[in-house]
UniProtKB/Swiss-Prot annotation:
Pfam families referenced in this protein's UniProt entry, alphabetically: PCRF, RF-1
A GO biological process held by the record: viral translational frameshifting
NCBIfam families named among the record's database cross-references: prfB
PROSITE patterns: RF_PROK_I
Protein name per its UniProtKB record: Peptide chain release factor 2
Gene that specifies this protein: prfB
Length: 365
């Protein structure tokens, strides 16, 4: 006779966890909302407003992921229970083996959904922007900023996210003084929101002829892209708009005309710029999107004292607000909030960030 206790214990655990996450994710409400969204998308007139149709389509995709997964888990557990009964009646080890395989697949699916539940913020499912800014330290800090940009681009690529370089300011000798990228993909902001903070690099500088150790800092700031229907009031009189000739990456066209745009929101001091579009009009539209997103995030930060303090101190990029330390000589990268370490420094700099990101999300940071 074969052993049934392990798989029955596993099924009991899967059943309990499925019910817990069903409640946590407000499954019944999502089912109702999915029906409403489907009904709206079936109306012919919805396509007269493509932006609304696109927003609803994105919402439907997110709702379907949760609803379909939970339904599949519930049905899957019932199917495994039926297989176990069949195996017992027929005394068939092969059927029990098949039941175990299906139970393991359900466990994997549930674990993935449990991780997704951490993306419960109102904008976690949206696209986002990532600003990188070099700290004091000249060329070394600017080179570090370019390394971080490459790291995040590689990470986004590994996730299947699309990236768009919105603005880049070249360093004096090498590297970058600042850069902004737009990241598009499911839960882009949810994945990256805990990456906001100071990143510290310790290494023997390739720019130091004496090969001495240097400590450099760069800041990352992640904020969600907000929909046009979010009520954010921007008074045109509060804006200073400058146009200039782009520098750095972007192709030949941007360097021939003064198409790059910089907008300063004078009441808040927020500055946004864009140079990747082919016209002033395109770049201005992109700048206004970024400005709306930053103003929204600023309002959200007022509800969170710690985040607000970090944003106010963002110009002082140094020892405060550090989230991660990259000590290349010791082959050690450590997240200072969760204690997670990775000694494969090259893999991390090549975009292997999930271990750090998942730990910070699970810690509720």
């Amino acid at each position: 006779m074969f052993e049934l206790n392990p798989i029955r214990t596993q099924l009991a655990d899967l059943t309990e966890r499925t019910q817990l996450i069903r409640g946590y994710l407000d499954f019944d409400t999502k089912v109702e909302r999915l029906e409403e969204v489907n009904a709206e998308l079936e109306q012919p007139e919805i396509w007269n407003t493509p932006e609304k149709a696109q927003t609803l389509g994105k919402e439907r995709s997110t709702l379907e992921m949760v609803v379909n997964t939970i339904n599949a888990l519930i049905q899957g557990i019932e199917d495994v229970e039926a297989l176990i009964e069949l195996a017992v009646e027929a005394e068939d080890e092969q059927t029990l083996y098949e039941a175990q395989i299906e139970a393991d697949e359900l466990a994997t699916k549930l674990a993935k959904l449990e991780f997704q539940r951490m993306f419960s913020g109102p904008y976690d499912a949206t696209d986002c922007y990532l600003d990188l800014q070099a700290g004091s330290g000249g060329t070394e800090a600017q080179d570090w900023t370019e390394m971080l940009l490459r790291m995040y681009l590689r990470w986004a690529e590994s996730k299947g996210f699309k990236t768009e370089l919105i603005e880049v300011s070249d360093g004096d000798v090498a590297g970058l003084k600042s850069a902004t990228i737009r990241i598009t993909g499911e839960y882009a902001f949810g994945w990256l929101r805990t990456e906001t903070g100071i990143h510290r690099l310790v290494r023997k500088s390739p720019f130091d002829s004496n090969n001495r150790r240097h400590t450099s800092f760069a800041a990352a700031f992640v904020y969600p892209e907000v929909d046009d229907d979010v009520d954010i009031e921007i008074n045109p009189a509060d804006l200073r708009i400058d146009v200039y000739r782009a520098s750095g990456a972007g192709g030949q066209h941007v360097n021939k005309t003064e198409s790059a745009v910089r907008i300063t929101h004078m009441p808040s001091g927020i500055v946004v710029q864009c140079q990747n579009g082919r016209s002033q009009h395109q770049n201005k539209d992109q700048c206004m999107k970024q400005l709306r997103a930053k103003l929204y995030e600023m309002e959200m930060m007022k509800k969170n004292a710690e985040k607000q303090a970090m944003e106010e101190n963002k110009s002082d990029i140094g020892w405060g607000s550090q989230i991660r330390s990259y000590v290349l000589d010791d082959s050690r990268i450590k997240d200072l909030r969760t204690g997670v370490e990775n000694r494969n420094t090259q893999a991390v700099l090549d975009g292997d960030l999930d271990r750090f990101i998942e730990a910070s999300l699970k810690a509720g940071l």
